Amino acid sequence: MGQELSQHERYVEQLKQALKTRGVKVKYADLLKFFDFVKDTCPWFPQEGTIDIKRWRRVGDCFQDYYNTFGPEKVPVTAFSYWNLIKELIDKKEVNPQVMAAVAQTEEILKSNSQTDLTKTSQNPDLDLISLDSDDEGAKSSSLQDKGLSSTKKPKRFPVLLTAQTSKDPEDPNPSEVDWDGLEDEAAKYHNPDWPPFLTRPPPYNKATPSAPTVMAVVNPKEELKEKIAQLEEQIKLEELHQALISKLQKLKTGNETVTHPDTAGGLSRTPHWPGQHIPKGKCCASREKEEQIPKDIFPVTETVDGQGQAWRHHNGFDFAVIKELKTAASQYGATAPYTLAIVESVADNWLTPTDWNTLVRAVLSGGDHLLWKSEFFENCRDTAKRNQQAGNGWDFDMLTGSGNYSSTDAQMQYDPGLFAQIQAAATKAWRKLPVKGDPGASLTGVKQGPDEPFADFVHRLITTAGRIFGSAEAGVDYVKQLAYENANPACQAAIRPYRKKTDLTGYIRLCSDIGPSYQQGLAMAAAFSGQTVKDFLNNKNKEKGGCCFKCGKKGHFAKNCHEHAHNNAEPKVPGLCPRCKRGKHWANECKSKTDNQGNPIPPHQGNGWRGQPQAPKQAYGAVSFVPANKNNPFQSLPEPPQEVQDWTSVPPPTQY
């Protein structure tokens, strides 16, 4: 018995070193459950007596069939992980002599007796890494009694792959006399094609006894349940630690205290699985720090994969910057604006449960819009449920709306990806049915250029806002051009005004490219020196080139536009008594009297006065008639006497002509 125990310890130590080379730490309780599961699903495996990749894949196929038939509840959570671990050991046994020796030794044990009674009790707790139990529980119980072991310890069960040599084989040598180098050479013969094949007869089958042991050790259900609980608690602790480390790493990289997607940053994000992929799924707990900071009602569902290939679903926090941007867009541009719908579609790419959608809409939209969206969403879910019923699909109205038996978040997290897609389609369709409220263009008219803001930046903000409202800036280019002039600062308006109807928006930008802070500062100083505002100074700047007003003498306007003419124009002076004639109230230069009020003649005006029309003289002075008086003259028809010769005289010239 001492030799058997020493041989077993040496084999366990060898297997421990083989696993250590792979960097894997195996637990006793997990491996024990795995061996029990292999025994239940594959009772033929220990009877064949050969361990190769082909037979081990048959074991994996049995696992998959068992999983498809009974579901994930009947399969241990570590079954597939340990199967992959042992598969890697079998694949690497040709390059690792230590693994090759362990596999060869196990094959010898299986060939010698498939129902060997072995005990595994290690005095050193550090060596208690892998369960190596026997299929014969009755023989095992007797061996335990012979060794004087305590009956309170749980009896061991059947080893699947890695077993120690039996103590009942009379041909087993002493472990101290075993040539381990020779054993490695013998194990290498199994896979060397140049050597002759190593043929052995298969172990005889005992038809009188069944393949599985008839007498099983009594297992306490409470103890087994406690082991499962302890295993789950340890899994939860490791997952929490994993999430906390990823969150801390993200904070160190970005310097931001709020970590939106730690799984993505840590490289653990996974593409969503489509229906039909048989992967065990569960829910892992999030970090306690996140639970205190962010409520659980507004998280999308994400799925991550741990190091063992298991998928876990949990809630991951929204990026609150996206939610804030969505609320701002819905308030400024409207719930159905193209920019707002683009944000909604980006958020809808996640797996959102009906509770998540309801919470998101209630936080972003007003109370009335939330009720409108909810009514449209329920109507869309009814139509989708009818189509699912006609197609034979079990996704009903309660699952789509998250009501009834599916009102809890835990139940909604386990939805299939196809169901999440139907919920997304119904929610986004209901969002598009929301009515347009207010004037969307009001936010566009509120975009004004700052005093020191470059005109190009102002136009960019204007075009961006127009694109969010109209869907494309080209749709409202004329409206944008008008607002680019009206909402510009006075300096840019003065530069654009002469060319306003001669160029387009790009011309506006080119005209205002030189207007910057220094130009604005000089313009303000010039306006202050002239005693005018900047706007008045720019309006009067081009008018000063026309000269001064002829009436008031000031610059900036003409005489016809002079506002001071009406104030300075006094009433006309009334003439008094005429100084020449003393008989009327009129100006002296307008007096036409010949005599004054005493009857004395008034001398004529000296100098050039107002002249009338010239008149012909009534009498010819100094003229001599040379026509003789002749009665036969045909031109003389007037019966008047002929004129006499007149003398020359001197008279003053007429005063007027």
UniProtKB/Swiss-Prot annotation:
Cellular component terms (Gene Ontology): host cell cytoplasm; viral nucleocapsid
Sorted UniProt keywords: Capsid protein, Coiled coil, Host-virus interaction, Lipoprotein, Metal-binding, Myristate, Phosphoprotein, Repeat, Viral budding, Viral budding via the host ESCRT complexes, Viral matrix protein, Viral nucleoprotein, Viral release from host cell, Virion, Zinc, Zinc-finger
Residues covalently joined to lipid (N-myristoyl glycine): G2
Motif (PPXY motif): 202-205
InterPro entries reported for this sequence: B_retro_matrix, B_retro_matrix_sf, Gag_p24_C, Primate_lentivir_Gag_pol-like, Retrov_capsid_C, Retrov_capsid_N, Retrovr_matrix, Znf_CCHC
GO biological process: viral budding via host ESCRT complex; viral translational frameshifting
Annotated region (Disordered), positions in chain: 113-178, 592-657
Family matches, as Pfam families: Gag_p10, Gag_p24, Gag_p24_C, zf-CCHC_5
UniProt cross-references to SUPFAM superfamilies, sorted A to Z: Retroviral matrix proteins, Retrovirus capsid dimerization domain-like, Retrovirus capsid protein, N-terminal core domain, Retrovirus zinc finger-like domains
GO molecular function: metal ion binding; nucleic acid binding; structural constituent of virion; zinc ion binding
Biased composition (Polar residues): 113-125, 140-152
Site description Cleavage, residues in chain: M100, A101, L162, T163, M216, A217, F299, P300, M525, A526, Y621, G622
Residue window of motif PTAP/PSAP motif: 210-213
Propeptide: 101-161
Renumbered zinc finger spans (CCHC-type): 547-564, 576-593
Chain coiled-coil ranges: 216-257
PANTHER family registered for this protein in UniProt: ENDOGENOUS RETROVIRUS GROUP K MEMBER 24 GAG POLYPROTEIN-RELATED, IGE-BINDING PROTEIN
Listed name of the protein: Gag polyprotein
